[in-house]
Amino acid sequence: MAGTDREKALDAALAQIERQFGKGAVMRMGDRTNEPIEVIPTGSTALDVALGVGGIPRGRVVEVYGPESSGKTTLTLHAVANAQKAGGQVAFVDAEHALDPEYAKKLGVDIDNLILSQPDNGEQALEIVDMLVRSGALDLIVIDSVAALVPRAEIEGEMGDSHVGLQARLMSQALRKITSALNQSKTTAIFINQLREKIGVMFGSPETTTGGRALKFYASVRLDIRRIETLKDGTDAVGNRTRVKVVKNKVAPPFKQAEFDILYGQGISREGGLIDMGVENGFVRKAGAWYTYEGDQLGQGKENARNFLKDNPDLANEIEKKIKQKLGVGVHPEESATEPGADAASAAPADAAPAVPAPTTAKATKSKATAAKS
């Protein structure tokens, strides 16, 4: 009897909450529809896999940080381009006043429809972010960067004045306001951040990010991006080998890493990443300098194979789909259910590939190999 009275009291409380705050303000978790996490692809298949859900999650706060010239803005611009290609509206808050529209265009960004703001101070920037997010019309908003969100008091004050904790308080207040609106409108906010060094640290990493601790707590995903190698064509530097570590992830297991190439003037090399992932997962076979996919030679050397995939986007999409299916990333449950043998079918060519002698494969695809080599 007591249990029944408690249930009646709970039902009455739930009904009162709904009347006062609206339908959906409180509910049993079992009554909530569990929809798959919507994502925005990053432009790198390896990073999409490392994130565990196939890209940057919608409706969340994301922080991208790293040293100077490590690829932070490039990575973010690829996400902007992918959001626009899916029909989404994107805003870019350029607090650094350093966005290069020509470079953004080369990465696939539709600069004519990109909403751009170059605010005068941090309060103005975050107020603009709040208003745009609450409009419910955006899919992605980028803030570049947290370090450039200078409080109004600091701008109006003298050069030597001390303003301890002003920026941290500003960020904390802004994140408290926008986090709920981001989730309700399914808008992703990407904050680009810079690194600073703490003085007097004897043990552990002296590196820290700007803007206080609030962003660390509110971010669902934090990406640490680093340049690990310079790519060269002869003696000329043509790009960077980049490593991204997922240091925080609330939507999938964290601490995974991804490596990919960023080519100067071109951005992330999607095709280069597909070749690396294809070899790693057995879909692309590497014999000496030659790269082969299902009996067809892609080219001699990674650069030729990369160009071949760039000229054949359908083939690149096919390889990407098989990689994601095998790793269970970016595939909805209903797709897996309708294609139960997809993984086995896609893995079959990779298993069979080593049994095929290299000379036979070369003869079968002589014309393609010649084209790729040239």
Curated annotation (Swiss-Prot):
One of its GO terms (cellular component) is cytoplasm. Its main location: cytoplasm. GO terms for biological process: DNA recombination; DNA repair; SOS response. SUPFAM superfamilies: P-loop containing nucleoside triphosphate hydrolases, RecA protein, C-terminal domain. Gene3D superfamilies: P-loop containing nucleotide triphosphate hydrolases. It is found in: Cytoplasm. It comes from the Bacteria. Residues 326-374 are annotated as: Disordered. InterPro entries: AAA+_ATPase, DNA_recomb/repair_RecA, DNA_recomb/repair_RecA_CS, P-loop_NTPase, RecA-like_C, RecA-like_N, RecA_ATP-bd, RecA_C_sf. Residues 338-374 have a biased composition (Low complexity). Keywords: ATP-binding, Cytoplasm, DNA damage, DNA recombination, DNA repair, DNA-binding, Nucleotide-binding, SOS response. Coiled coil: none annotated. One of its GO terms (molecular function) is ATP binding. ATP binds at residues 66-73. HAMAP family: RecA (MF_00268). NCBIfam families: tigrfam_recA (TIGR02012). Belongs to the RecA family. Can catalyze the hydrolysis of ATP in the presence of single-stranded DNA, the ATP-dependent uptake of single-stranded DNA by duplex DNA, and the ATP-dependent hybridization of homologous single-stranded DNAs. It interacts with LexA causing its activation and leading to its autocatalytic cleavage. This is Protein RecA. The lineage of its organism: Bacteria, Bacillati, Actinomycetota, Actinomycetes, Kitasatosporales.
